[in-house]
């Protein structure tokens, strides 16, 4: 590798590349979430018959992974670059390897392996065939073909490529700590994020108000159900995301037992499944507007038969 790209140059390179492959460049969704997969740009759009190609950076919060800004690789919040393509291109793996080349990583000069790691997200009733992508022994990407999202079978199949930006940048810049990553010329990752990492870790593990969080979960769940009763999928999904983040805060604080944990996950999953079914029903009511006219007319005729 010649020039060591900054963190923001890595993002810009990936954005331009996937834009050239036909992806819309979306912006990070403005609600806390544990992974880019939970964005409505992936979760909702991966289901139903309409095509969808999108790429976006997603800050992902995992309260239990916080380490007060002291661990070089474990973070309360990390950044994912998410690519979602439906239907999945037959050459999606080749497209991915080409993206690495643009980042200065030549597949002929490095040990790049696709290690089978089938993916499942119990909170959203989602699963798929998956692989971890290992670069010289370090995982940098999760590669998934969705089989089920929100309890619904995906047809056509959606391909998801999730780059771990911190890990990728650490490798490209040859640094051992994420806090030493150069975000922009002259500005280190730690100068931006170390203090927030410390404060969020302290809040998650020591300060958070458990009683308030428990009450909030109940209120968010009730509001999500109320929205779904009125077929308001997107407001409902916002509250489902709030339920998920609130549960993660409770879990990090040790406020839920093993039995209670399973119960909370089931409650979130049930909401996600209803949201998924409602979303598909609403898209059908609208006539699947992203389908071409011939496919739309054929599909609607088959569903009415």
Swiss-Prot record:
One of its GO terms (cellular component) is cytosol. Belongs to the class-II aminoacyl-tRNA synthetase family. GO terms for molecular function: ATP binding; catalytic activity, acting on a protein; glycine-tRNA ligase activity; transferase activity. It is found in: Cytoplasm. The keyword Magnesium does not apply. NCBIfam families: glyQ (TIGR00388), PRK09348.1 (NF006827). PANTHER family: GLYCINE--TRNA LIGASE, CHLOROPLASTIC_MITOCHONDRIAL 2 (PTHR30075:SF2), GLYCYL-TRNA SYNTHETASE (PTHR30075). Coiled coil: none annotated. Keywords: Aminoacyl-tRNA synthetase, ATP-binding, Cytoplasm, Ligase, Nucleotide-binding, Protein biosynthesis. This is Glycine--tRNA ligase alpha subunit. It comes from Streptococcus mutans serotype c (strain ATCC 700610 / UA159).
């Amino acid at each position: 590798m010649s020039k060591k790209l900054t963190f923001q140059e890595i993002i810009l390179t990936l954005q331009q590349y996937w834009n050239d492959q036909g992806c819309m460049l979306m912006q990070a969704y403005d609600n806390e979430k544990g992974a880019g997969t939970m964005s409505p740009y992936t979760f909702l759009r991966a289901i139903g018959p309409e095509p969808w190609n999108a790429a976006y950076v997603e800050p992902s919060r995992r309260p239990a992974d916080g380490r007060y800004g002291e661990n070089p690789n474990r973070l309360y919040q990390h950044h994912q670059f998410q690519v979602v393509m439906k239907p999945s291109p037959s050459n999606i793996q080749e497209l991915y390897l080409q993206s690495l080349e643009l980042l200065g990583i030549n597949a002929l000069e490095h040990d790049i392996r696709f290690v089978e790691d089938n993916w499942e997200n119990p909170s959203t009733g989602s699963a798929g065939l998956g692989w971890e992508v290992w670069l010289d022994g370090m995982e940098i990407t999760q590669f998934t073909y969705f089989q089920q999202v929100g309890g619904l079978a995906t047809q056509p199949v959606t391909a998801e490529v999730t780059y771990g930006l911190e890990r990728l940048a650490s490798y490209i810049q040859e640094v051992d700590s994420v806090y030493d990553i150069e975000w922009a010329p002259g500005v280190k990752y730690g100068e931006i994020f170390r203090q927030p990492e410390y404060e969020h870790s302290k809040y998650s593990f020591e300060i958070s108000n458990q009683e308030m969080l428990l009450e909030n979960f109940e209120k968010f769940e009730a509001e999500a159900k109320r929205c779904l009763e009125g077929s308001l999928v997107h407001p409902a999904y916002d509250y489902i995301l709030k339920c998920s983040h609130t549960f993660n805060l409770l879990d990090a604080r040790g406020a839920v037992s093993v039995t209670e944990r399973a119960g909370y996950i089931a409650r979130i999953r049930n909401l996600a499944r209803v949201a998924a079914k409602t979303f598909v029903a609403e898209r059908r009511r609208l006539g699947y507007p992203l389908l071409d006219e011939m496919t739309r007319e054929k599909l609607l005729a088959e569903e009415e038969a």
